[in-house]
Amino acid sequence: MHGGKDNYTYLTTAPIRRVIPTMAVPTIVGMLVTSLYVIADTFFVGQLDTQSTAAVGVVFPLMFFMQAFGFFFGHGSGNYISRELGARRHGNARRMAADGFFLSLFTGLTLMTLGLVFLHPLALLLGSTPTILPLTESYLSVSLLGMPFLMSSLTLNNQLRLQGNAAYAMVGIVTGAVLNVALDPFFIFLLDLKVQGAALATVIGQVVSFLLLFRMSHHEGNIGIYWRDFAPSWPAVKEIFYGGSPSMSRQGLLCVSTMLLNHAAGTWGDAAIAGMSIVGRITMLVMAVVIGLGQGFQPLCGFCYGAKLYSRLKRAWWFTTIVGTVFLLVVSGLGWLFSSELIALFRDDMEVVAVGVVALRWQLLTLPLCATMMSSNMLTQTCRKPWRANLLAASRNGLFFIPSILVLPCWLGLTGVEVCQSVSDLLAFIVTVPVMVYTFRELRA
């Protein structure tokens, strides 16, 4: 970790092969442990029955919805902060930190209230079937209570990370996630709260993360959050939109696509929903490493863009992309060999495993392409190329996935549901390549 005064020199001059791992490792750890919020719920609830597993899977899109807003405010304010620190304009960075945090907190409180008021229609919208509706509502009602804490935690996390203080960001998120995993068996089995206990453990972890991150934002070398700095203006909101809308597109469309996936899989019963939701969690865990690597690249990208060090920025992008691709190739090979065991680890049900194995193997075929897509999206987002960043963010889970999930099951049945993500990944990669060629031509040293 480097103090605020040292971050500029470190991010703009130190060797790339040292800077990115230094920034990425805490972020990867944070991303992996954050994934345990939902992985742990799936694992422990999976010990109950298939219906409980499906109910938790149905609420899964809500996590993406909350992340969409948290990343919108976090990346929107954080990317601006990193550019302003790179340009040595610290006052602007301080005001943006307060604007991003408080707007995120107030938005979370508003959405939580709306969700609780419209609980029943929300459960149906998420894709619940009549057989699991009571379980879905039970899990959902508690999960909504954590919305303002998760959203504002993600905002703080990304602000700290994009200042170059990834270790602080990691500690706050990891502590809450570890607490969640520890509390899951206590609430689910010992107190016999079942799916509601899983949600309660998650909310407690989110509250703890929020408190720690807020406290750490006031440590020396970080930009503290103060009410006196909160003065949102149209230029500030516009900067948040430019920097955060790609994250909103990416996570928001992931929410929509997962709901459509639940509805499509529901045609073949609760086992199909459970199988597809388990595959979603496995790939989410793998992608957490690649996203963490990309987020380790972002502070360097933002500082170098602000300092006009474009050649260094491009070299860092290539380093990030190559490392991410190699990692995904290795993981995809191992996942293909042990696909049955991976699915059965979460729910040892023959129907669930049958659906999950086929879907997982299809996704693993195109997973290595995701490293290029992710690093490209983060570069265009951090370098204030909002329309290109939004196009890349929307491609994988929206532009191509949504038509695929609406059309392919009609032609191929359940197989159409299982292959949708692979088709979308391939088409999104084809779009990414020319966008990056054009962007690199603009970034001339």
Regions found by a protein language model. Name each.
Residues 1-24, 81-148, 190-245, 301-366, ...:
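Short alpha-helical transmembrane segments in multi-pass integral membrane proteins
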Residues 11-43, 47-48, 64-76, 80, ...:
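N-terminal transmembrane alpha-helices
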Residues 22-41, 142, 153, 176, ...:
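Transmembrane helical elements of multi-pass membrane transporters/channels
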Residues 32, 36-54, 123-130, 186-193, ...:
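Helix-terminus/linker motif at the lipid-water interface of multi-pass membrane proteins
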Residues 33, 37, 66, 70, ...:
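Residue-level hotspots within pore-lining transmembrane alpha-helices
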Residues 53-113, 150-169, 275-339, 370-389:
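Small-residue-rich hydrophobic transmembrane alpha-helices
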Residues 65-68, 112, 180-185, 209-214, ...:
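Hydrophobic transmembrane alpha-helices of multi-pass small-molecule transporters
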Residues 74, 143-161, 169-177, 198-211, ...:
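Short runs within selected transmembrane alpha-helices of multi-pass transporters and secretion channels
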